[in-house]
Structures are given as C-alpha cells and as structure tokens.
Amino acid sequence: MVPVNEDLQTSAPRRDGGAGHVAESAAGRLSEDRDARQGEDMPQHGHLVVEARAAGFWRRALRHPGFVVGSLLVLALVLMAGVSAFWTPYGPEDLDMEAVLEPSSAAHWLGTDAFGRDVASLLLLGAQASLLAGVIAVGIGLGAGLLLGLLAAARPGRVQGLIMRTADFMLAFPAILTAIMLTAVFGAGLGNAIVAVGIYNIPSFVRITRAAAAGVWSREYAMAARACGLGPWQITWRHVLPNILPLLLVQATVRFAVAILAEAALSFLGFGVQPPQPSWGRMLADAQSVLFEAPLQALWPGLAIMLAVLGLNLLGDGLRDLLDPKLRRR
C-alpha cells in the first residue's frame, strides 16, 4: 500500500473550509449590497406609493357624482365671495329710488330691491358673510372640540366625565336658540353671530372626536405603543390623530353647512349682519314686505342658501364614501 501523506489529508479540508468561507463572505457582501440598494430605493418607492394613492383617490372622486356636484357648488360659493371682494356691479349703499323693484335688465341682472339696490351685487356680497361665518365658526368648533375630545379620550375618569357632561348639557338646547341667547348677551353683529355659532359647534366635535379616539385607543397598536413606554400625548399625536382626521373632515363640511344656515337665520331675525352690509338672511328679511309684489326678491337669496348647503352636504357625503375603507369595499 502507498502511504498517504498526512499533510495532504489535513490540507484538503482546510482548502474546502477556505473556499466555503470565501463563498459565505461573498454572499454576505452581495446581501449587504442588495439591502443597501433596497434602502436607497425605499424613499423613491414610498414617494411612488403616495402618488399612486393620491391618483387613485382622485380617480374615484371624479367618478363619484355627489362629490363632483358638491365640489362645483362649493367652488361657486368661493368664487362668488372672492370676486365680490374686488368687484361688484354696484355697492351695497348705492340706492336708486327711481328704480325700485325693477325686473331683470341689462343694468340690473337680477333686478332691484325695495330700496333700489342691485340684487346681483347684494347676492355676491352676501356670499362673503356666509363663507366667513362657515370658516371661522367651524374653525372655532373644530379647534376647541378636537382638543377637548382628545383630552377626554386620553384621560378617562373625572376629566372625561366633566367634558362629556358639559357637551351633553350644551347639546340639550336647540342650535338657533343657543345662538340667539349668545348674541342677545354679547350684542348683534356678524362677529358675535359667528362666535355664537362656533361655540355651539364645539360639543358636536367633542363627542365625535372622543368616540373616534376611544376606538383607536382600544386597538392593539395603541396598546403596544403604551407598553413600549410612549406617553398619552405621544400616542395621540402618532396614532390617534391621523386615524380620526378623515372623520373630522367629513364632520367639518356638515358643520359648515349648519353655520351658513345659522348665520342666515340670525341675520334674518336681526341678530346677525346689520345694514347696510348685505347678507342672504338679511335679503330674505327685506323681501318679506314685498313678497307678493316681487316674489323673486326672496327667490334669489333662498336659492343661494339652498345650493350652498346642498353643495356642502354632497361634498361631505362624497368624502365619507371616499375616505371610509368599509364603504370603499362595497
């Protein structure tokens, strides 16, 4: 028998082991390079995902008839208010006693009222009061209601009980009655009317925010975040608030419509916009005395209020259908 060199026997495994080590090292480097490339591509891919979701949202929105019609009506309201801020055919104090209750003409597109004022100009200027009332009143209600609702959800117990019982007490009174009481205390005027409507909006946002936030607090990821040591307000900011914003957006459109109705009602009763500043509600009040002589005087402001409220409600329903995952699956 030929003797086998022991050095050769021991060197073979070493060569195999070295080759395996080199292969493993190369595979490790390839894996690290692949992970690095994936890490570099992640921001770009994330950006593409966001763009795809946004494009998908707008495709669904354009196929939703209620959202489209509501958006057009709300856009018309904004355009009326914006145009009237820079230009109107006549001013609110331009009186022509020789052209009282005239029908539509080239000089006065929608005729004149009982004081000889141009109805089209008053209608355009009245959109400013309605839009301003809606924006500020909803801002007051949403800002205060969101903070109080989140506080009630994050602090169950006495704090939650005090906040919710106060909201229930405020909701026990009719909306217009509450607004009239507040304007009677603070005085008539557009500013006080807007504040009154905004205060009444607070309890509605408190209830909705508290209920939605409490549902998020009961989810597993919120409980896991608490177990990891995050504080209540950190969890609220990172997890609760992003999940309830779509619901609050839908509610804001509904309360916007309520604010326009409330401002028109207060102005109609004499607690809102004061003459000579125009308001759709004030135009309805002025048209009462000439309702049988010139019924169109009441038609135009009433139609404007109806279309504005209808547009906001359709927009809110469309947003709810588009943002609610349960409704999207149907």
What is each residue range found by the language model?
Residues 119-151:
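Transmembrane alpha-helix signature in integral membrane proteins
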Residues 59-74, 131, 135, 292-299:
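Membrane-interface helix starts
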Residues 199-200, 246-256, 295-330:
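C-terminal transmembrane helix and the adjacent membrane-cytosol boundary/short C-terminal tail
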Residues 1-72, 314-330:
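Transmembrane alpha-helical segments of polytopic membrane transport and secretion proteins
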Residues 171, 182-185, 197, 212-213, ...:
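Glycine-rich helix-loop "coupling/hinge" segments at transmembrane-helix boundaries
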Residues 5-7, 28, 72, 76, ...:
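Hydrophobic alpha-helical transmembrane segments of membrane transport/permease proteins
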Residues 109, 113, 119, 143, ...:
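Generic hydrophobic transmembrane alpha-helix motif, especially the helices
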